[in-house]
Swiss-Prot record:
Record-level Gene Ontology MF annotations: DNA binding; DNA-directed RNA polymerase activity; ribonucleoside binding
Catalytic activity: RNA(n) + a ribonucleoside 5'-triphosphate = RNA(n+1) + diphosphate
Gene designation: rpoB
Record's subcellular location: Plastid, Chloroplast
Lineage of the species this protein comes from: Eukaryota, Viridiplantae, Streptophyta, Embryophyta, Tracheophyta
Name used for this protein in its record: DNA-directed RNA polymerase subunit beta
Native source species: Nicotiana tomentosiformis
EC number, UniProt record: 2.7.7.6
């Protein structure tokens, strides 16, 4: 619980609550709704009827545990059983059976699903809400054209537009337009009914010509005209039943189904009272929409803001899973229908269990979790990453936008985002503004709208009442901003406060305020809420910081931050990284892998996570926090997880930093560090890599795992056990064999080596015909083997291979090339590691740990790091930790600066160190050069900020190529570290080389080292024998490719050679 002295205490909702509520809604309501839609199925003679009994469905508890599902690469799911009856109409007999129709993946306590052993999470999607929206655009003459766009529940669009002559046209899927009268008549109305149900009948009559009267003379004529325009069919189509069915299927079902949300929006926008269960577009809707369009043409009514959140809806986990379940039932219906017909045709007696198969449901969910863009692999770099991933909101995905086509207006911040979508936390790059993050107090309402909480201000009641308002409701209230929270209640009536009303910011008297914010963090996401002094930072740098905190690597020795915001504990609790006591009891036994808790007459075993690999190769490990014999309360922390300390999030380290230049080593965001950070393992982290190999059954026989591998040196096989698998605890280096494997192959007599043929002829020894296909350790993979898993699945077929996985632990100290960052977007690369005696040192003799460039602060406008830096120094000297809510200027002016200076002054007094706070230059201190012992000319800001080590590490990035593969078409080296590719020399690199006049290097880059096939073959030979490298005479392959491509366009390219002797032009073919 967090609160302010003058406000009611508000509890921050669970950060995974959005996922839990969505999945529970799917299980409670979505399953039943879709099962009720399953139709009764009859055979062609209508003698047999198949019917589901929805009330009796049941979900069975999973047969395996979560850990086993991850270990064995299985899906953590529940079996769904449904009862059905087969009714013979002639005899009125019914056969009822309960059968299994498929597996539904379940959600675990982290808000994720485990599919094939992989943690996956479903992202919430923002879509345009179904309904009608009015907007105006300027035509080529500069005249406003008003249109009304009707969006169906499936995303189909139809438009109504009014022209300069006040004629109303309907445009379906951007094709030819038809008159509104033809559309209304095709939907079943005659002319009299149309004129009776509109507000402006004279306008409708004004564009009713004789030709138009003939088109709407009867419903059949209107349908034919509409079909001709809609389907772009030439000639004169004839009215028929099949034509009506085609029109019904292509137009009315796809573009006229509004759904419950669409019907509600349509009724509100057009002031209609059509029942909610009538979810299709009616002629009454079309006529009311046309009336509103006419009103807009003559200056009555308001246009819609398409980017307002009241016109958006959230497609949550429940909606996505329900859609997939409905799709699976449609497939199941087709299977049942086909099976019934087949059984009757072959004169077999069907049973309900024989008619139904579990394949449609199981395969539908497998393909959804594996292939759908909104189903993503959970990012588990650190605990914060896990929570934030589940709270993302995406405009992308099926039915949504794309990064290439989305406009700036859609990406921009909208006033309706206040308290619902974080204005800071979004992706960088092409998806900026399209992938956002939920504000910490936001929740998804019943109708798919984002709701935000407010306190109601009432004169009658002194109590505090909290309301959750949708985006369409809060714009009718005067909402006081966050800086009015701490006003004195005795004089509130006399004060003037800033407020928000109808997307505008006003300054009004306190008595006019209806609602007020409940919390300073209300409008931020979790990532942005963890940045102290965020109000002093530029928003771009805050965005970088909220993204970079998710890239922080869990360190071997975590440390909680001195300066925080207070949300660190809540983030750690909801991340699932901690081991929490589920009940009261006493600890009777502790070990590195489990805790035994005695209580209520039995003993509960709580397993701990030990050296578990995340999908980003970071190490997830739980450390015991309770001694044996201690009594535990329910909810108490038993063990800390990765990147947590004492139940609080701990992503980095508090290190001593100076802001000053140092010999150019920290220019352009480079960072200079002390060797203390290496030798004392301050920034040491553990990483676990997984290596995997499968054994198949080939056409020549099964592959064999063995430690007897011919033609391999003994030292490469030294770590294998008798089964041919590396032993636990072994230290392995690059090139070592992890799993020995032989694959059988057919070898012809002629392909044997001479010595093998001799052995066969003289001694009769059968030479091995197997090929060595061992699992070898790749470059940069050296480390300690901590786990080996041999997963054997039932049936040793080639489709179900055995899998052997080897997990290797690496210990990585911080080194040159690693990336570090603060919490204010101040990131940098380690440029040099200095001996601690050469680092600048303070007046008390302590050497600095890091040196940052001061030029990185003023231009980036992230001054919050200076406040954090100085307050961190005071906290380390006073042994205090600070938890500061953002926007503390609401208490008084310059509140942040006063707090920092007062703490520095107190630290100076208590520690008797006057250099900590010097009035001439507060916050700065004179420090000394470690190499000479002389003081620097200017005082320098020193402090203890919280610095993170990011996952962008030099061990994963650095790469060199001596030889490798070439692309077949261009004959140039492949691209990328994974393919052992080469460096690409682009235009700008060539310019740089040209600037220095290095002609030979340029020639090598364009020929030998790139795509000149003959020249690079000759280089090897001349290098070996020591001759001079010949100059290439013909063109490289890329030039030859260009010539061929031009020839494919019927362009012949020739070139001319100018003789040096007589300058005669000799023409040669390319």
């Amino acid at each position: 619980m967090l609160g302010d002295g003058n406000e009611g205490i508000s509890t921050i909702p669970g950060f995974n609550q959005i996922q839990f509520e969505g999945f529970c809604r799917f299980i409670d309501q979505g399953l039943t709704e879709e099962l009720y839609k399953f139709p009764k199925i009859e055979d062609t003679d209508q003698e047999i009827e198949f019917q589901l009994f929805v009330e009796t469905y049941q979900l069975v508890e999973p047969l395996i545990k979560e850990r086993d599902a991850v270990y064995e690469s299985l899906t953590y799911s529940s079996e769904l059983y449904v009862s059905a009856g087969l009714i013979w109409k002639n005899s009125r007999d019914m056969q009822e059976q309960t059968f299994f129709i498929g597996n539904i993946p379940l959600m675990n306590s982290l808000g994720t699903s485990i599919v094939n052993g992989i943690y996956r999470i479903v992202i919430n999607q923002i879509l345009q809400s179904p309904g009608i929206y009015y907007r105006s655009e300027l035509d080529h003459n500069g005249i406003s054209v008003y249109t009304g766009t009707i969006i169906s529940d499936w995303g189909g669009r139809s438009e109504l537009e009014i022209d300069r002559k006040a004629r109303i046209w309907a445009r379906v899927s951007r094709k030819q337009k038809i008159s509104i009268l033809v559309l209304s008549s095709a939907m079943g109305l005659n002319l009299r009914e149309i004129l009776e149900n509109v507000c402006y009948p004279e306008i409708f009559l004004s564009f009713l010509s004789d030709k138009e009267r003939k088109k709407i003379g009867s419903k059949e004529n209107a349908i034919l005209e509409f079909y001709q325009q809609f389907a772009c069919v030439g000639g004169d189509p004839v009215f028929s039943e099949s034509l009506c069915k085609e029109l019904q299927k292509k137009f009315f079902q796809q573009r006229c189904e509004l759904g419950r949300i669409g019907r509600r929006n349509m009724n509100r926008r057009l002031n209609l009272d059509i029942p909610q269960n009538n979810t299709f577009l009616l002629p009454r809707d079309i006529l009311a929409a046309a009336d509103h369009l006419i009103g807009l043409k003559f200056g009555m009514g308001a246009l819609d803001d398409m980017n307002h959140l009241k016109n958006k809806r959230i497609r949550s986990v429940a909606d996505l899973l329900q859609d997939q379940f409905g799709l699976a039932l449609v497939r199941l219906e087709n299977v049942v229908r086909g099976t019934i017909c087949g059984a009757i045709r072959h004169k077999l007696i069907p049973t309900p269990q024989n008619l139904v198969t579990s394949t449609p449901l199981t395969t539908t969910y497998e393909s959804f979790f594996g292939l759908h863009p909104l189903s993503q692999v959970l990012d588990r770099t650190n605990p914060l990453t896990q929570i934030v991933h589940g709270r993302k909101l995406s405009y992308l995905g099926p039915g949504g936008l794309t990064g290439r086509t989305a406009s700036f207006r859609i990406r921009d911040i909208h006033p309706s985002h206040y308290g619902r979508i974080c204005p800071i936390d979004t992706s960088e790059g092409i998806n900026v503004g399209l992938i956002g993050s939920l504000a910490i107090h936001a929740k998804i309402g019943h109708w798919g709208s984002l709701e935000s909480p407010f306190y109601e201000i009432s004169e009658r009641s002194t109590g505090v009442r909290m309301l959750y308002l949708s985006p369409g409701r809060d714009e009718y209230y005067m909402v006081a901003a966050g800086n009015s929270l701490a006003l004195n209640r005795d004089i509130q009536e006399e004060q003037v406060v800033p407020a928000r009303y109808r997307q505008e910011f006003l300054t009004i008297a306190w008595e006019q305020v209806h609602l007020r914010s409940i919390f300073p963090f209300q409008y931020f996401s979790i990532g942005a809420s963890l940045i102290p002094f965020i109000e002093h930072n530029d928003a771009n740098r805050a965005l970088m910081s909220s993204n970079m905190q998710r890239q922080a690597v869990p360190l071997s020795r975590s440390e909680k931050c001195i300066v925080g915001t207070g949300l660190e504990r809540q983030a750690a609790l909801d991340s699932g990284a901690l081991a929490i006591a589920e009940r009261e009891g006493r600890v009777v036994y502790t070990n590195t892998d489990k805790i035994l808790l005695a209580g209520n007459g039995d003993i509960l075993s709580i397993p701990l996570v030990i050296y578990q690999r995340s999908n980003k190769n970071t190490c997830m490990h739980q450390k015991l926090q309770v001694p044996r014999g201690k009594c535990i309360k329910k909810g108490q922390i038993l063990a800390d997880g990765a990147a947590t300390v004492g139940g609080e999030l701990a992503l980095g380290k508090n290190v001593l930093v100076a802001y000053m230049p140092w010999e150019g080593y920290n220019s352009e965001d480079a960072v200079l560090i002390s060797e203390r950070l290496v030798y004392e393992d301050i920034y040491t982290s553990f990483h676990i890599r997984k290596y995997e190999i499968q054994t198949h059954v080939t056409s020549q026989g099964p592959e064999k795992v063995t430690n007897e591998i011919p033609h391999l040196e003994a030292h490469l096989l030294r770590n294998l056990d008798k089964n041919g698998i590396v032993m636990l605890g072994s230290w392995v280096e690059t090139g070592d064999i992890l799993v020995g494997k032989l694959t059988p192959q057919v070898v012809k007599e002629s392909s044997y080596a001479p010595e093998d043929r001799l052995l066969r002829a003289i001694l009769g020894i059968q030479v091995s015909t197997s090929k060595e296909t061992c699992l070898k350790l790749l470059i940069g993979g050296r480390g300690r083997v901590i786990d080996v898993r041999w997963i054997q699945k039932r049936g040793g077929s080639s489709y179900n291979p055995e899998t052997i996985r080897v997990y290797i632990l690496q210990k990585r100290e911080i080194k040159v090339g690693d990336k570090v960052a603060g919490r204010h977007g101040n990131k940098g690369i380690i440029s040099k590691i200095l001996p601690r005696q050469d680092m600048p040192y303070l007046q008390d003799g302590r050497s600095v740990d890091m040196v940052f460039n001061p030029l990185g602060v003023p231009s980036r406008m992230n001054v919050g790091q200076i406040f954090e830096c100085s307050l961190g120094l005071a906290g380390s000297l006073l042994d205090r930790h600070y938890r500061i809510a953002p926007f503390d200027e609401r208490y008084e002016q310059e509140a942040s600066r006063k707090l920092v200076f007062s703490e520095l002054y107190e630290a100076s007094k208590q520690t008797a160190n006057p250099w900590v706070f010097e009035p001439e230059y507060p916050g700065k201190s004179r420090i000394f050069d470690g190499r000479t012992g002389n003081p620097f000319e200017q005082p320098v800001i020193i402090g203890k900020p919280y610095i993170l080590k990011l996952i962008h590490q030099v061990d994963d990035k650095i790469h060199g190529r001596s030889s490798g593969h070439y692309a077949l078409v261009t004959q140039q080296p492949l691209r990328g570290r994974a393919k052992q590719g080469g460096q690409r020399v682009g235009e700008m690199e060539v310019w740089a080389l040209e600037g220095f006049g290095v002609a030979h290097i340029l020639q090598e880059m364009l020929t030998y080292k790139s795509d000149h096939i003959r020249a690079r073959q000759e280089v090897l030979g001349t290098t070996i024998i020591g001759g001079t490298i010949p100059n290439p005479e013909d063109a490289p392959e890329s030039f030859r490719l260009l010539v061929r491509e031009l020839r494919s366009l019927a362009l012949e390219l020739n070139h001319f050679l100018v003789s040096e002797k007589n300058f005669q032009i000799n023409r040669k073919e390319a």
